[in-house]
Amino acid sequence: MSVWGMVHALTIRSPVARGSLKEIKCPALPEEYFLITEKNIQGENKLADFPVPVLAGEKLSYAGQPLAILVGPVESELEDIASRITIDAEDEKASFSITSNDPGDVIVGRDLISGDPDMALGEGGIIVSGNYITEIQEHWYPEPHGALAVPFSDKGKKAEESLTIYTSTQWPYHVRRSVSGVLGWDDGRITVTPTIMTVHLDGKIWYPSLVACHAALAAQVTGKPVKLMLRREEDFMYSPKRNKADIQMCSTLSENGSIHGSIIQVQLDLGSEGVFADEIIDQTCLGALGTCYHDTFKVDGEGVRTNIPPQGPMAGFGLSQGFFAAERHFSHIADYVGQDPAEWRKNNSLKKNQNLAIGIPLKDTVPLVELIDAAASMSDYYRKWASYELLRKRRRSEKWEFAGAPLRGIGIATAWQGSGFLNHNETENSNYSVEVTLEKDGFLEIKSSLISSSARYLDTWQNLARDILGVDPSLVRLTSNTGEAPDSGPGTLSRNISLITRLMEQCLTSIRKMRFRNPLPITVKRSIKPETINGWVPEKKIDLSAFAHPSWGAAVTEIEIDPVSLDPNVRGIWLAIDGGKILNERRARRTLHTAAIHALGWTCREQLRYEEGKIPIEYYRYYDIPAPDNIPPIKVDFLKSGALHRKGIGELPFSCLPASYVQAVSQAMDYHFEKIPLNARDIWDVWKLKQMESSK
């Protein structure tokens, strides 16, 4: 996208992970070129809702932190000037560990207890423990972050008094509030027009606001339209990633193998700032308790500040990391007590009218037994598990060697997913709206700030208009810019299908009742305000509706390990889902299929980590996302539940597929693996260990 008179911008970044900025040494700039620093900020130097500086001042918190914006008409000239800019910074000792941190580095904490788990563990008996680690993951969206800021005149106003931002964002109103805050303007002077984007996996929820602020600052200083587009490599290095989680679990078991008490320690790497800190810590702690019942439990959670870029959501806000730990732990327990992991889960799963640990009651039937049996039936799980288990036990008495035959295993895991933010105060505005107008000419206009970020739902909304009002889908038009559309909140956590579609349906139903009694045009606006209860922290309210009707899923993964390369090859993935009322089954299957591919990448392919606060360039060059010829057979089936609620389902594969995969590899190797990504080197290390043990 470009406009007449547009200039370009690029970002000057910190070379150190932690320190103090002394000086930015810039060569003499040609005419029409500018270097913009935090001293040019007329408003507040932070994003709305989050403590993220727009441009660093004296304090430097991570390598790659934006220090200045270089602006000019020719991109190649900007790159040449940037190469001659030097940063004088005093380097300080940085923190990169979440397990050996200073107490002052804890951004957010949770201390949750139910019953007396310490006494339960003190009584002795069977105790099972594990340390479960999930590494970071890149969103790898098709287009890097970027923004175009266009100053304009309207009815005699000066050009710099109004601004339109074009950017690919899940949260247009957050962009507006952030830009108006940094410019020192009223919100109404900023219009955000979200551009169409494809699969983003929550990578476009808050970072576009930072890029938009940079472009807007440049437009304010120069009085010209400014386009700032990150290079793909730059985006990869400095944009948020799925945060790392380190979860330790220790459980004592009753005689029948059920969990008598659990003590869980959750440590999360949130990077330099606590973006969505409360939501991520709460959802991770909830996920770490899993889908099974604990007689008593204690959860100690910490979100830790380190000197890497701010970390954030990735296809959810921490449930997946928590569920990986819980589901691996449950499989470990089942293995320890000699039970089929599927049968153990069926005997210990949550039930209707029990509460989630945070206090939200489960109002619907909990269909875990049915889902486990459905996934098992699709995959022939029970027969395969028994067969592979016999082979595993036989190998214990044999010498480990390259016998030529592949080792096979099969794993199962379960999870649930809410639909919306758990924390009522996570965003400034929690009263979200949709507006629908039936025009005289037969057109139907839907106004929602979520539409552009959820373009794949357009046909769903068009079909609703056809079914309720008889409006031809071609006559449905969508408006999403913040100048006309109401605030519908961020497009994440399946809010588009569970909340916005419900509001839209209410608008359409109201118009149907009015259309033959009232003259056209007819406009109806519907809003929703969360029903809140007290959460784990007294001053933090949680949204009861977001998790009262969760979706549920079960995943089975079958693998075989090549006896020469030790690469695990996936023979099949089976997903059984209770998604409530499904509006478009074909689209729902596609959503789950895509999510399963990305979840598989996180589980076994996408090797990525920070080293001394930076991502080595090799990780970017060789980042290994699943290619089409690497995608195994994936089968999805939906449980026919007759539910009236529409439920989010897109995160379920991330929450149950990784644990099922690792369990399958664990059965094949007769070893309890506890981390992802899990690769051939990890398997090779265990293979050598097995050879040493068998030779004794």
Residue ranges and their predicted role:
Residues 1-370, 377, 387-696:
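Cofactor-binding beta-sheet edge motifs in enzyme active sites
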Residues 378-382:
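Short, basic alpha-helical nucleic acid-contact segments in DNA-binding proteins
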